Amino acid sequence: MRQRRSVVAVSVKPKGFKLGHKQGSMSTTSPPPSSPDGNVSTSGPSAIKLSKNWELPQRLKPGRKPKSKRGDASANNDGSSKIKKVQTSNQKDQMTTKDHENEGAKGHEGKSDDEGNGSGDENGVDSVEKRRRQNRDAQRAYRERRTTRIQVLEEKVEMLHNLVDDWQRKYKLLESEFSDTKENLQKSIALNNELQKALPLIVNTPFQQQPENPPDNPISILEMVENFKPIGAVSLKKGKLKAHC
């Protein structure tokens, strides 16, 4: 014969949730034994009691994604805390060893200082004199560089002044040429206007033809008067005179 399986219905009534930094332990109670009839009394107290302290996640920085699992985060935190503890312990050990070494070195330095005070004073004086000499040399070199630089700049300035003077002379020469050409242009324009006005008069005047073979050396009227010589008297016959009368 088959055995009947008993089914137990459990009612859960959680308590109020509390917020805190530590997770609380879950307190559970064992369920009551199942009744042979399969009926459960719901009027009695709750069989399971849950109590859990919820922990709020830390506020994330902008641009970072939240972690998917809290278990991984807690494990990482535990591991990082362990690593930090180991590092701090190692640092403490290193500091103690360094302190011991420094104390030993100070002891040796004190002995060596006591032994070489005289030589140290001499070395200090030499180092001061050497430093002063180096400073004097550096200042002298700086002054020389400054004077050479000033000379170079003065030469450049003088060259630029000469160049400016040349361009000014060229400008004045071109300006005078421009003014002369402008005057000549105005004169030629005025002459052209006069010729245009006289053109219709020239066209309407009759054309006079000049002789084809003009004399090579034309004689002026004054020369003709000066070179004039009177002719001698001519005797006329009486019969001719009467006829004329």
Swiss-Prot record:
**Gene Ontology molecular-function annotations:** DNA-binding transcription factor activity; sequence-specific DNA binding; transcription cis-regulatory region binding
Where composition is biased (Polar residues), the residues are 74-94
Annotated GO biological process: positive regulation of transcription by RNA polymerase II
Annotated segments matching region Disordered:
1-144
Composition bias of kind Basic and acidic residues appears in 95-114, 135-144
Region annotated Basic motif sits at 130-149
Q: Where is this region: Leucine-zipper?
A: 153-181
Question: Do you know which PANTHER family this protein is assigned to?
Answer: AP-1-LIKE TRANSCRIPTION FACTOR YAP1-RELATED (PTHR40621:SF6), TRANSCRIPTION FACTOR KAPC-RELATED (PTHR40621)
Q: Other remarks on record?
A: One of 8 closely related fungi-specific YAP proteins (YAP1 to YAP8), which all seem to be transcription activators of the environmental stress response and metabolism control pathways and to have similar but not identical DNA binding specificities.
Assembly and interactions?
Homodimer.
The Swiss-Prot or TrEMBL record describes its family as follows: Belongs to the bZIP family. YAP subfamily.
Q: What does this protein do?
A: Probable transcription activator linked to cell cycle that induces transcription activation of genes in the environmental stress response and metabolism control pathways, like the closely related YAP5.
- Entry protein name: AP-1-like transcription factor YAP7
Designated gene of the protein: YAP7
